[in-house]
Protein backbone atom coordinates (compact mmCIF):
# COMPACT_ATOMS: atom_id res chain seq x y z
CA UNK A 1 0.00 0.00 0.00
CA UNK A 2 1.29 3.48 -0.83
CA UNK A 3 2.54 5.51 2.12
CA UNK A 4 4.53 8.68 2.63
CA UNK A 5 8.08 8.74 3.85
CA UNK A 6 10.38 11.75 3.42
CA UNK A 7 13.42 9.80 2.20
CA UNK A 8 11.45 7.51 -0.08
CA UNK A 9 9.74 10.54 -1.61
CA UNK A 10 13.13 11.59 -2.98
CA UNK A 11 12.86 8.51 -5.26
CA UNK A 12 9.46 9.63 -6.62
CA UNK A 13 9.26 9.95 -10.41
CA UNK A 14 6.13 11.83 -11.55
CA UNK A 15 3.92 10.20 -14.18
CA UNK A 16 2.11 12.14 -16.89
CA UNK A 17 -0.26 10.83 -19.53
CA UNK A 18 -0.37 12.07 -23.12
CA UNK A 19 -3.83 13.26 -24.16
CA UNK A 20 -5.41 11.96 -27.41
CA UNK A 21 -4.08 13.67 -30.55
CA UNK A 22 -7.44 15.11 -31.61
CA UNK A 23 -8.65 16.35 -28.21
CA UNK A 24 -8.94 19.77 -29.86
CA UNK A 25 -10.07 18.96 -33.40
CA UNK A 26 -8.77 20.36 -36.66
CA UNK A 27 -11.53 23.01 -36.61
CA UNK A 28 -10.29 24.29 -33.24
CA UNK A 29 -13.19 22.81 -31.27
CA UNK A 30 -12.86 21.04 -27.90
CA UNK A 31 -15.01 18.11 -28.97
CA UNK A 32 -15.95 16.10 -25.90
CA UNK A 33 -15.20 17.93 -22.64
CA UNK A 34 -17.55 15.71 -20.62
CA UNK A 35 -15.97 12.50 -21.88
CA UNK A 36 -12.48 13.83 -21.25
CA UNK A 37 -13.41 15.01 -17.76
CA UNK A 38 -14.55 11.50 -16.86
CA UNK A 39 -11.19 10.13 -18.02
CA UNK A 40 -9.15 12.83 -16.26
CA UNK A 41 -10.96 12.14 -12.99
CA UNK A 42 -9.96 8.47 -13.32
CA UNK A 43 -6.33 9.41 -14.01
CA UNK A 44 -6.26 11.70 -10.98
CA UNK A 45 -7.75 8.96 -8.79
CA UNK A 46 -5.00 6.62 -10.04
CA UNK A 47 -2.38 9.04 -8.69
CA UNK A 48 -1.26 10.41 -12.07
CA UNK A 49 0.59 13.73 -11.69
CA UNK A 50 -0.42 15.45 -14.92
CA UNK A 51 -1.09 15.29 -18.64
CA UNK A 52 0.75 16.31 -21.79
CA UNK A 53 -0.95 17.88 -24.80
CA UNK A 54 -0.01 18.96 -28.31
CA UNK A 55 -0.74 22.64 -28.91
CA UNK A 56 -0.99 22.53 -32.70
CA UNK A 57 0.36 25.42 -34.76
CA UNK A 58 -1.89 24.21 -37.60
CA UNK A 59 -4.95 24.79 -35.40
CA UNK A 60 -4.03 27.99 -33.56
CA UNK A 61 -2.62 30.07 -36.43
CA UNK A 62 -4.61 28.50 -39.25
CA UNK A 63 -6.58 31.62 -40.28
CA UNK A 64 -3.56 33.73 -41.27
CA UNK A 65 -0.21 35.12 -40.08
CA UNK A 66 -0.43 36.15 -36.40
CA UNK A 67 -4.17 35.41 -36.31
CA UNK A 68 -4.15 33.19 -33.23
CA UNK A 69 -7.21 31.59 -31.64
CA UNK A 70 -6.50 30.04 -28.24
CA UNK A 71 -10.11 29.74 -27.01
CA UNK A 72 -10.56 25.95 -27.30
CA UNK A 73 -7.23 25.32 -25.59
CA UNK A 74 -8.19 27.69 -22.77
CA UNK A 75 -11.27 25.56 -22.06
CA UNK A 76 -9.12 22.43 -22.12
CA UNK A 77 -6.53 23.91 -19.74
CA UNK A 78 -9.32 25.05 -17.41
CA UNK A 79 -10.65 21.49 -17.27
CA UNK A 80 -7.21 20.00 -16.56
CA UNK A 81 -6.80 22.53 -13.73
CA UNK A 82 -10.22 21.68 -12.26
CA UNK A 83 -9.27 18.00 -12.26
CA UNK A 84 -6.19 18.72 -10.13
CA UNK A 85 -3.61 17.69 -12.73
CA UNK A 86 -0.47 19.47 -13.95
CA UNK A 87 0.12 20.21 -17.63
CA UNK A 88 3.00 19.72 -20.07
CA UNK A 89 2.34 21.79 -23.21
CA UNK A 90 3.98 20.87 -26.53
CA UNK A 91 4.58 23.67 -29.02
CA UNK A 92 3.69 21.45 -31.98
CA UNK A 93 5.04 23.12 -35.12
CA UNK A 94 4.67 19.90 -37.14
CA UNK A 95 1.88 18.20 -39.01
CA UNK A 96 -0.07 15.44 -37.30
CA UNK A 97 -0.53 12.54 -39.73
CA UNK A 98 1.99 10.34 -41.50
CA UNK A 99 3.84 9.00 -38.46
CA UNK A 100 3.46 5.93 -36.25
CA UNK A 101 0.22 6.18 -34.26
CA UNK A 102 -1.14 9.29 -36.02
CA UNK A 103 -4.89 8.73 -36.03
CA UNK A 104 -5.94 12.26 -36.98
CA UNK A 105 -4.64 14.68 -39.60
CA UNK A 106 -3.73 18.24 -38.64
CA UNK A 107 -1.62 19.92 -41.35
CA UNK A 108 0.59 22.95 -40.73
CA UNK A 109 -1.29 26.24 -41.44
CA UNK A 110 -2.77 26.59 -44.93
CA UNK A 111 -1.18 30.01 -45.50
CA UNK A 112 2.23 28.35 -45.01
CA UNK A 113 1.32 25.47 -47.34
CA UNK A 114 0.27 28.12 -49.90
CA UNK A 115 3.78 29.62 -49.79
CA UNK A 116 5.04 26.07 -50.37
CA UNK A 117 3.00 25.88 -53.57
CA UNK A 118 5.19 28.53 -55.20
CA UNK A 119 8.34 27.63 -53.24
CA UNK A 120 8.28 23.89 -52.45
CA UNK A 121 11.87 24.12 -51.16
CA UNK A 122 10.53 25.33 -47.80
CA UNK A 123 9.96 21.63 -47.06
CA UNK A 124 12.46 18.89 -46.30
CA UNK A 125 13.30 17.09 -49.54
CA UNK A 126 14.96 13.74 -50.26
CA UNK A 127 17.39 13.09 -53.11
CA UNK A 128 14.65 12.08 -55.57
CA UNK A 129 12.89 15.41 -54.93
CA UNK A 130 9.96 14.24 -52.81
CA UNK A 131 8.82 16.99 -50.43
CA UNK A 132 7.83 16.29 -46.84
CA UNK A 133 5.18 18.73 -45.67
CA UNK A 134 5.22 17.81 -41.97
CA UNK A 135 7.67 20.50 -40.94
CA UNK A 136 9.63 23.40 -42.47
CA UNK A 137 13.22 22.66 -43.46
CA UNK A 138 15.89 24.11 -41.15
CA UNK A 139 17.10 25.74 -44.36
CA UNK A 140 14.43 28.46 -43.97
CA UNK A 141 15.00 29.11 -40.25
CA UNK A 142 16.42 32.55 -41.02
CA UNK A 143 14.85 33.30 -44.42
CA UNK A 144 12.17 36.07 -44.24
CA UNK A 145 9.92 34.46 -46.85
CA UNK A 146 6.76 33.97 -44.78
CA UNK A 147 5.03 37.32 -45.33
CA UNK A 148 8.22 39.00 -44.14
CA UNK A 149 8.91 36.66 -41.22
CA UNK A 150 11.49 33.90 -40.90
CA UNK A 151 10.50 30.44 -39.65
CA UNK A 152 12.24 31.18 -36.33
CA UNK A 153 10.24 34.41 -35.98
CA UNK A 154 7.02 32.49 -36.63
CA UNK A 155 7.85 30.02 -33.84
CA UNK A 156 8.94 32.84 -31.53
CA UNK A 157 5.77 34.91 -32.11
CA UNK A 158 3.64 31.80 -31.49
CA UNK A 159 5.32 31.10 -28.15
CA UNK A 160 4.99 34.75 -27.06
CA UNK A 161 1.30 34.66 -27.95
CA UNK A 162 0.92 31.43 -25.95
CA UNK A 163 2.53 33.09 -22.95
CA UNK A 164 0.28 36.17 -23.18
CA UNK A 165 -2.92 34.19 -23.69
CA UNK A 166 -2.20 31.45 -21.17
CA UNK A 167 -0.78 33.75 -18.49
CA UNK A 168 -3.40 32.69 -15.91
CA UNK A 169 -2.33 29.04 -16.26
CA UNK A 170 1.36 29.97 -16.10
CA UNK A 171 0.76 32.08 -12.97
CA UNK A 172 -1.28 29.36 -11.28
CA UNK A 173 1.58 26.93 -12.07
CA UNK A 174 -0.76 24.57 -13.89
CA UNK A 175 1.76 24.49 -16.76
CA UNK A 176 5.02 22.97 -15.56
CA UNK A 177 6.84 22.46 -18.79
CA UNK A 178 6.97 23.68 -22.35
CA UNK A 179 8.11 21.05 -24.83
CA UNK A 180 9.49 22.93 -27.81
CA UNK A 181 8.73 21.12 -31.08
CA UNK A 182 11.83 21.07 -33.28
CA UNK A 183 10.94 18.73 -36.13
CA UNK A 184 8.64 15.99 -37.40
CA UNK A 185 6.63 14.39 -34.57
CA UNK A 186 7.90 17.29 -32.43
CA UNK A 187 11.35 15.68 -32.34
CA UNK A 188 14.75 17.23 -33.07
CA UNK A 189 15.42 15.21 -36.23
CA UNK A 190 14.96 15.08 -39.98
CA UNK A 191 11.88 13.27 -41.40
CA UNK A 192 14.11 10.44 -42.59
CA UNK A 193 11.58 7.61 -42.18
CA UNK A 194 8.18 8.89 -43.39
CA UNK A 195 5.52 6.19 -43.57
CA UNK A 196 3.50 8.26 -46.04
CA UNK A 197 6.39 7.94 -48.52
CA UNK A 198 6.49 4.17 -48.20
CA UNK A 199 9.13 3.73 -45.48
CA UNK A 200 8.69 0.54 -43.46
CA UNK A 201 10.63 -0.67 -40.42
CA UNK A 202 13.59 -1.36 -40.39
CA UNK A 203 14.52 0.64 -43.51
CA UNK A 204 17.59 2.87 -43.10
CA UNK A 205 15.69 5.99 -44.20
CA UNK A 206 17.01 8.79 -46.40
CA UNK A 207 18.90 12.04 -45.91
CA UNK A 208 16.51 15.02 -46.17
CA UNK A 209 18.69 17.96 -47.16
CA UNK A 210 18.09 18.35 -50.88
CA UNK A 211 15.94 21.51 -50.75
CA UNK A 212 17.63 24.46 -52.44
CA UNK A 213 18.28 26.26 -49.14
CA UNK A 214 20.16 23.40 -47.47
CA UNK A 215 21.90 22.54 -50.75
CA UNK A 216 23.26 26.10 -51.00
CA UNK A 217 24.30 26.00 -47.34
CA UNK A 218 26.21 22.75 -47.90
CA UNK A 219 27.93 24.05 -51.05
CA UNK A 220 29.05 27.19 -49.19
CA UNK A 221 30.34 25.10 -46.26
CA UNK A 222 32.22 22.74 -48.61
CA UNK A 223 33.79 25.67 -50.50
CA UNK A 224 34.86 27.23 -47.20
CA UNK A 225 36.53 23.94 -46.29
CA UNK A 226 38.43 24.05 -49.60
CA UNK A 227 36.30 21.39 -51.31
CA UNK A 228 33.95 23.20 -53.68
CA UNK A 229 33.76 19.97 -55.72
CA UNK A 230 31.91 18.10 -52.92
CA UNK A 231 28.20 17.43 -53.46
CA UNK A 232 25.47 16.03 -51.22
CA UNK A 233 25.49 12.20 -51.04
CA UNK A 234 24.24 10.31 -54.11
CA UNK A 235 25.11 6.81 -52.86
CA UNK A 236 23.07 6.47 -49.65
CA UNK A 237 20.26 4.31 -51.04
CA UNK A 238 16.52 4.67 -50.46
CA UNK A 239 14.06 4.38 -47.56
CA UNK A 240 13.86 0.60 -47.29
CA UNK A 241 17.44 -0.38 -48.07
CA UNK A 242 19.70 -2.19 -45.65
CA UNK A 243 23.04 -0.47 -44.95
CA UNK A 244 25.22 -3.02 -46.73
CA UNK A 245 23.36 -2.54 -50.02
CA UNK A 246 24.52 1.11 -50.20
CA UNK A 247 27.93 2.56 -51.02
CA UNK A 248 27.51 5.16 -48.29
CA UNK A 249 26.82 2.86 -45.31
CA UNK A 250 28.50 -0.41 -46.32
CA UNK A 251 31.62 -1.64 -44.51
CA UNK A 252 34.35 0.94 -45.19
CA UNK A 253 31.72 2.99 -47.04
CA UNK A 254 31.55 6.70 -47.86
CA UNK A 255 30.50 7.54 -44.29
CA UNK A 256 34.07 6.85 -43.13
CA UNK A 257 35.80 9.03 -45.78
CA UNK A 258 36.81 12.66 -45.30
CA UNK A 259 33.92 13.75 -47.53
CA UNK A 260 31.43 11.53 -45.69
CA UNK A 261 32.52 12.78 -42.28
CA UNK A 262 32.32 16.39 -43.45
CA UNK A 263 28.77 15.86 -44.72
CA UNK A 264 27.58 14.04 -41.57
CA UNK A 265 29.05 16.74 -39.33
CA UNK A 266 27.36 19.47 -41.38
CA UNK A 267 24.03 17.57 -41.47
CA UNK A 268 23.92 16.93 -37.72
CA UNK A 269 25.20 20.43 -36.83
CA UNK A 270 22.21 21.91 -38.69
CA UNK A 271 19.97 20.30 -36.07
CA UNK A 272 22.13 21.45 -33.15
CA UNK A 273 21.98 25.02 -34.40
CA UNK A 274 18.24 24.78 -35.13
CA UNK A 275 17.47 23.50 -31.63
CA UNK A 276 19.73 26.08 -30.03
CA UNK A 277 18.16 29.04 -31.85
CA UNK A 278 14.57 28.02 -31.13
CA UNK A 279 15.28 27.17 -27.48
CA UNK A 280 16.81 30.63 -27.15
CA UNK A 281 13.55 32.13 -28.46
CA UNK A 282 11.53 29.88 -26.12
CA UNK A 283 13.69 30.99 -23.22
CA UNK A 284 13.00 34.66 -24.05
CA UNK A 285 9.27 33.98 -24.46
CA UNK A 286 8.90 32.22 -21.09
CA UNK A 287 11.52 34.14 -19.12
CA UNK A 288 10.50 34.45 -15.47
CA UNK A 289 7.72 31.83 -15.71
CA UNK A 290 7.92 28.86 -13.35
CA UNK A 291 8.32 26.35 -16.17
CA UNK A 292 11.00 24.07 -17.55
CA UNK A 293 11.80 23.98 -21.27
CA UNK A 294 12.17 20.56 -22.87
CA UNK A 295 13.05 19.09 -26.23
CA UNK A 296 12.29 15.66 -27.62
CA UNK A 297 14.87 13.34 -29.16
CA UNK A 298 13.71 10.32 -31.15
CA UNK A 299 14.67 6.76 -30.22
CA UNK A 300 16.11 5.40 -33.48
CA UNK A 301 16.97 1.96 -32.14
CA UNK A 302 17.21 0.03 -35.43
CA UNK A 303 20.69 -0.53 -36.94
CA UNK A 304 22.14 0.67 -33.60
CA UNK A 305 24.21 -2.53 -33.42
CA UNK A 306 25.55 -2.04 -36.96
CA UNK A 307 28.86 -0.18 -37.21
CA UNK A 308 27.26 2.41 -39.49
CA UNK A 309 24.22 3.26 -37.30
CA UNK A 310 22.56 4.08 -40.65
CA UNK A 311 19.05 4.92 -39.43
CA UNK A 312 20.40 7.31 -36.79
CA UNK A 313 22.65 9.03 -39.35
CA UNK A 314 19.84 9.71 -41.84
CA UNK A 315 17.74 11.15 -38.98
CA UNK A 316 20.55 13.59 -38.14
CA UNK A 317 22.05 11.83 -35.12
CA UNK A 318 25.74 11.42 -36.05
CA UNK A 319 26.25 8.59 -33.60
CA UNK A 320 28.87 5.87 -34.15
CA UNK A 321 30.66 3.48 -31.82
CA UNK A 322 33.50 6.02 -31.54
CA UNK A 323 31.41 9.23 -31.74
CA UNK A 324 28.57 10.19 -29.40
CA UNK A 325 25.80 11.84 -31.40
CA UNK A 326 23.58 12.62 -28.40
CA UNK A 327 25.76 14.24 -25.75
CA UNK A 328 26.31 17.38 -27.91
CA UNK A 329 22.51 17.79 -27.98
CA UNK A 330 22.42 17.50 -24.18
CA UNK A 331 25.21 20.08 -23.92
CA UNK A 332 23.27 22.46 -26.19
CA UNK A 333 20.16 21.96 -24.03
CA UNK A 334 22.17 22.70 -20.86
CA UNK A 335 22.67 26.30 -21.98
CA UNK A 336 18.89 26.81 -21.82
CA UNK A 337 18.40 25.02 -18.45
CA UNK A 338 16.32 22.49 -20.40
CA UNK A 339 15.21 18.89 -20.14
CA UNK A 340 16.01 16.21 -22.71
CA UNK A 341 12.99 14.02 -23.33
CA UNK A 342 13.75 10.61 -24.86
CA UNK A 343 11.53 7.85 -26.14
CA UNK A 344 11.33 4.01 -26.42
CA UNK A 345 11.71 3.55 -22.65
CA UNK A 346 9.53 0.43 -22.73
CA UNK A 347 11.49 -1.55 -25.31
CA UNK A 348 13.73 -4.53 -24.63
CA UNK A 349 16.34 -5.86 -27.08
CA UNK A 350 14.92 -9.37 -26.79
CA UNK A 351 11.58 -8.19 -28.24
CA UNK A 352 13.22 -6.92 -31.44
CA UNK A 353 13.83 -9.00 -34.56
CA UNK A 354 17.53 -9.71 -35.06
CA UNK A 355 17.61 -8.55 -38.70
CA UNK A 356 16.99 -4.93 -37.60
CA UNK A 357 20.18 -4.97 -35.47
CA UNK A 358 18.14 -3.05 -32.95
CA UNK A 359 19.31 -2.22 -29.41
CA UNK A 360 16.81 0.04 -27.65
CA UNK A 361 18.16 -0.74 -24.16
CA UNK A 362 21.72 0.33 -24.99
CA UNK A 363 20.43 3.38 -26.86
CA UNK A 364 18.35 4.53 -23.86
CA UNK A 365 21.31 3.91 -21.57
CA UNK A 366 23.61 5.96 -23.83
CA UNK A 367 21.26 8.92 -24.26
CA UNK A 368 20.16 9.16 -20.62
CA UNK A 369 23.76 8.82 -19.41
CA UNK A 370 24.83 11.58 -21.81
CA UNK A 371 22.17 13.90 -20.40
CA UNK A 372 23.22 13.20 -16.82
CA UNK A 373 26.91 13.68 -17.71
CA UNK A 374 26.00 17.16 -19.02
CA UNK A 375 24.15 17.87 -15.75
CA UNK A 376 20.71 18.24 -17.29
CA UNK A 377 17.45 16.57 -16.35
CA UNK A 378 16.24 13.76 -18.58
CA UNK A 379 12.65 12.67 -19.02
CA UNK A 380 11.06 10.13 -21.32
CA UNK A 381 8.11 8.30 -22.76
CA UNK A 382 7.22 4.97 -24.30
CA UNK A 383 7.24 4.78 -28.11
CA UNK A 384 4.28 2.44 -28.59
CA UNK A 385 1.22 1.71 -26.44
CA UNK A 386 1.82 -1.22 -24.10
CA UNK A 387 -0.30 -2.52 -21.23
CA UNK A 388 1.84 -5.40 -19.94
CA UNK A 389 4.01 -5.78 -16.83
CA UNK A 390 7.19 -6.37 -18.86
CA UNK A 391 6.93 -2.97 -20.54
CA UNK A 392 6.06 -1.16 -17.30
CA UNK A 393 8.97 -2.81 -15.47
CA UNK A 394 11.36 -1.71 -18.20
CA UNK A 395 10.12 1.90 -17.93
CA UNK A 396 10.57 1.81 -14.14
CA UNK A 397 14.10 0.40 -14.57
CA UNK A 398 15.00 3.28 -16.90
CA UNK A 399 13.42 5.80 -14.52
CA UNK A 400 15.71 4.62 -11.69
CA UNK A 401 18.49 2.59 -13.36
CA UNK A 402 20.18 1.77 -10.04
CA UNK A 403 17.04 1.31 -8.01
CA UNK A 404 15.63 3.21 -5.04
CA UNK A 405 17.64 4.54 -2.13
CA UNK A 406 15.73 4.17 1.14
CA UNK A 407 17.89 6.84 2.79
CA UNK A 408 17.55 9.67 0.27
CA UNK A 409 17.70 10.49 -3.42
CA UNK A 410 18.70 7.61 -5.72
CA UNK A 411 21.99 7.83 -7.65
CA UNK A 412 20.12 8.18 -10.94
CA UNK A 413 16.54 9.30 -11.44
CA UNK A 414 14.63 10.50 -14.47
CA UNK A 415 12.83 13.82 -14.09
CA UNK A 416 9.50 12.41 -15.20
CA UNK A 417 7.86 9.90 -17.54
CA UNK A 418 4.94 10.52 -19.88
CA UNK A 419 2.82 7.51 -20.77
CA UNK A 420 1.61 7.31 -24.35
CA UNK A 421 -1.37 7.69 -24.39
CA UNK A 422 -4.84 8.16 -22.88
CA UNK A 423 -7.34 5.85 -24.59
CA UNK A 424 -10.29 3.57 -23.89
CA UNK A 425 -7.84 0.65 -24.02
CA UNK A 426 -5.77 2.10 -21.18
CA UNK A 427 -8.87 2.58 -19.04
CA UNK A 428 -10.18 -0.93 -19.74
CA UNK A 429 -10.42 -2.60 -16.32
CA UNK A 430 -7.53 -5.09 -16.32
CA UNK A 431 -5.24 -2.69 -18.21
CA UNK A 432 -6.01 0.14 -15.81
CA UNK A 433 -5.38 -2.05 -12.75
CA UNK A 434 -1.81 -2.73 -13.83
CA UNK A 435 -1.33 0.90 -14.90
CA UNK A 436 -2.31 2.01 -11.37
CA UNK A 437 0.35 -0.32 -9.95
CA UNK A 438 2.85 1.20 -12.39
CA UNK A 439 2.06 4.70 -11.07
CA UNK A 440 2.56 3.58 -7.46
CA UNK A 441 5.91 1.94 -8.30
CA UNK A 442 7.09 5.03 -10.23
CA UNK A 443 6.18 6.96 -7.07
CA UNK A 444 8.43 4.57 -5.08
CA UNK A 445 5.41 3.14 -3.22
CA UNK A 446 4.50 6.63 -1.98
CA UNK A 447 1.08 8.23 -2.13
CA UNK A 448 0.47 10.85 -4.81
CA UNK A 449 2.45 13.95 -3.82
CA UNK A 450 1.02 17.39 -4.61
CA UNK A 451 4.14 19.30 -3.60
CA UNK A 452 7.01 18.79 -6.08
CA UNK A 453 9.41 20.30 -3.54
CA UNK A 454 9.06 17.12 -1.49
CA UNK A 455 10.66 15.11 -4.31
CA UNK A 456 13.21 17.83 -5.21
CA UNK A 457 11.28 19.20 -8.19
CA UNK A 458 10.59 22.79 -7.15
CA UNK A 459 10.59 24.88 -10.34
CA UNK A 460 12.20 28.32 -9.98
CA UNK A 461 11.37 31.17 -12.40
CA UNK A 462 13.08 30.52 -15.75
CA UNK A 463 16.45 32.28 -15.99
CA UNK A 464 17.93 33.68 -19.20
CA UNK A 465 19.85 31.13 -21.31
CA UNK A 466 23.58 30.97 -20.66
CA UNK A 467 26.17 32.30 -23.12
CA UNK A 468 26.34 30.78 -26.57
CA UNK A 469 28.41 27.57 -26.66
CA UNK A 470 30.74 27.56 -29.71
CA UNK A 471 30.12 24.60 -32.01
CA UNK A 472 33.64 23.24 -31.41
CA UNK A 473 32.89 23.08 -27.68
CA UNK A 474 29.59 21.32 -28.35
CA UNK A 475 31.41 18.80 -30.52
CA UNK A 476 33.87 18.00 -27.73
CA UNK A 477 30.91 16.11 -26.28
CA UNK A 478 31.14 13.65 -29.19
CA UNK A 479 33.96 11.87 -27.30
CA UNK A 480 32.39 8.63 -26.08
CA UNK A 481 32.15 8.15 -22.32
CA UNK A 482 31.03 4.87 -20.81
CA UNK A 483 27.36 5.01 -19.83
CA UNK A 484 26.33 4.64 -16.20
CA UNK A 485 25.73 1.02 -15.17
CA UNK A 486 22.09 -0.15 -15.19
CA UNK A 487 20.63 -2.84 -12.94
CA UNK A 488 19.45 -5.88 -14.90
CA UNK A 489 15.90 -5.41 -13.61
CA UNK A 490 14.01 -2.92 -11.48
CA UNK A 491 13.68 -3.36 -7.71
CA UNK A 492 10.12 -2.00 -7.94
CA UNK A 493 8.27 -4.38 -10.25
CA UNK A 494 4.57 -3.91 -10.91
CA UNK A 495 4.15 -7.68 -10.60
CA UNK A 496 6.84 -8.28 -7.96
UniProtKB/Swiss-Prot annotation:
SUPFAM superfamilies recorded: (Trans)glycosidases (SSF51445)
Record keywords: Carbohydrate metabolism, Glycosidase, Hydrolase, Polysaccharide degradation
Active site per the UniProt annotation: 187, 381
One MF annotation (Gene Ontology) recorded for this entry: beta-amylase activity
Designated name of the protein: Beta-amylase
Claim: Hydrolase is one of the keywords in the record: yes
Disulfide linkage: none
A Gene Ontology biological process term: polysaccharide catabolic process
UniProt catalytic activity: Hydrolysis of (1->4)-alpha-D-glucosidic linkages in polysaccharides so as to remove successive maltose units from the non-reducing ends of the chains
Highest taxon, organism lineage: Eukaryota
Family the UniProt entry places it in: Belongs to the glycosyl hydrolase 14 family.
Coiled coil: none
Class of this enzyme: hydrolase
Amino acid sequence: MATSNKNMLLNYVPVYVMLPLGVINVNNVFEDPDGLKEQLVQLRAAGVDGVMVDVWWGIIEQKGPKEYDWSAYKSLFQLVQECGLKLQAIMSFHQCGGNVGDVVTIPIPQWVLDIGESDPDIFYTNRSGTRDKEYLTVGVDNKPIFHGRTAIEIYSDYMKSFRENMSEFLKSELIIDIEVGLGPAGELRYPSYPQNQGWVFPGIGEFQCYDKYLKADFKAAAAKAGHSEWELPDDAGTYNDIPESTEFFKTNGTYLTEKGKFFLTWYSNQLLNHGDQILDEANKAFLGCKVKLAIKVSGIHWWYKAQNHAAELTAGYYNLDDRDGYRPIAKMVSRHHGILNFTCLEMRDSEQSSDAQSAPQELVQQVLSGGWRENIEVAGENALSRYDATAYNQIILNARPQGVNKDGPPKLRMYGVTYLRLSDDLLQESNFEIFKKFVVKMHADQSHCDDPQEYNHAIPPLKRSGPNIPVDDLLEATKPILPFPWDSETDMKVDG
